[in-house]
Amino acid sequence: MNLKRIVAVAAASAVAFGAVVSISTPSLAATNVCKATDLKTAGGMDALVKAAKKEGELNVITLPRDWANYGEAMDLFSKAFGIKINDDNPDGSSAYEIQTIKTAPAAKQPDVVDIGVSALNGVIGAGQDKLFANYKVANFNAIPSKWKADNGNWYGDYNGIIGISYDASVSPAPTKIADLTNPAYKGQIALTGDPTAGQEPFMSVYAASLANGGSVDNIQPGLDFFKKIKASGNFTSVKATGENYVAGAYKIALTWNFNAPGNIASAKAAGKNLKFVIPTDAVLAGTPYIQAINAKAPHCAAARLWEEFLYSENKGKTSAQLTAKDIKLTGSKLFNTIMGGQNVFVSGGAAPILQADMIKKNSIIDGPEGFNVPKGAKVYQPSPDQQVTGKALVAAQWPTL
């Protein structure tokens, strides 16, 4: 089903306000931040920062520190605003995030989610529970219309390319997905999770399909590929996490390029030498991950401030550069002093959703080298409709491969 069509049924469109963060917008006399649908109705940036600081906490979910540079994002946000961040199940899946919103007690509810686009199927649309709150960040107008709900119910944040991470001891070093059938890799290959639940492993199956004669319309060759390497003993069911890698439980994984810089740094700190390559036989770009505010968010102001931060294009200071003097600034001045989340993603190797706008404004920083698409390579990206079809096949076949 078409993502925009789902949203059109789910909610009426609203007119977005300007994208510039106001420094001096007055606080509203009786502001209910939990009902705020944009920065203006939240009382302006100074009022939002004050309210978020008063709450003092932010509940996030399934955010590994080395995922898209989220470790820096959380450190910077927490240091700047004095807000404690609680991260539930960092190595969980998009499915876990949705299930937690539906079933967790009030105190354990996440304030915000970061989920794969395929997780929206069955979550938004006619007859579905209203899991998310409508909120338009200041830069809402600059988000491509394809990747946002007209009413601000959800919006894309960043995306990446599927690549191969591997221990430097692996020989021969893999350069394409088809290489992973090599008997030399017996017991060494893993995915970052269950493709029926997580977006990254799901996209890894798509990449395997492209490398084996499939297409974004046909994920079956990818399933056949994993069935083959499972039967040969190359594929292991252990989850590809940093802890399992350091323990030697696997040596090769399919992963997003935006996780590679953080993974390599973490591996080095543990005395391991991790490498990364974009496969030459399949260059697959994921659709953007999706941000949304939980309609039952226990920290309404912190949730909205977090989203404003993630969609800021500021080039500003990192957590290491932020000073005690900076932290004493008023809310809006402090907000405009720190590096915006879109550039934090860039520094981790991700492609930010506001990239086109940032290039136009010259507000984008340089990302790390060596993790980008090879020059001249053809990039494939499955649409939301194609992912719905692909997910159904994976759900039906993966458990019995």
Indicate where each model-derived feature is located.
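C-terminal region of N-terminal signal peptides and the immediate post-cleavage residues
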Residues: 18-34
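A ligand-binding cleft/hinge motif common to bilobed small-molecule-binding domains
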Residues: 119-124, 252-272
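A bilobed periplasmic-binding-protein/Venus flytrap-type ligand-binding module shared by bacterial periplasmic
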Residues: 163-170, 205-212, 286-299, 318-321, ...
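C-terminal capping/gating helix-and-loop segments adjacent to ligand/active sites or protein-protein/ligand interfaces
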Residues: 317-401
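Short beta-strand->loop
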Residues: 132-141, 152-155, 181, 266, ...
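Short, polar/charged alpha-helical segment
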Residues: 42-53, 63-84
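Periplasmic-binding protein-like
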Residues: 145, 159-161, 223-228, 234, ...
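Extracytoplasmic ligand-binding site segments that recognize negatively charged/polar headgroups
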Residues: 59-75, 86-102, 108-249
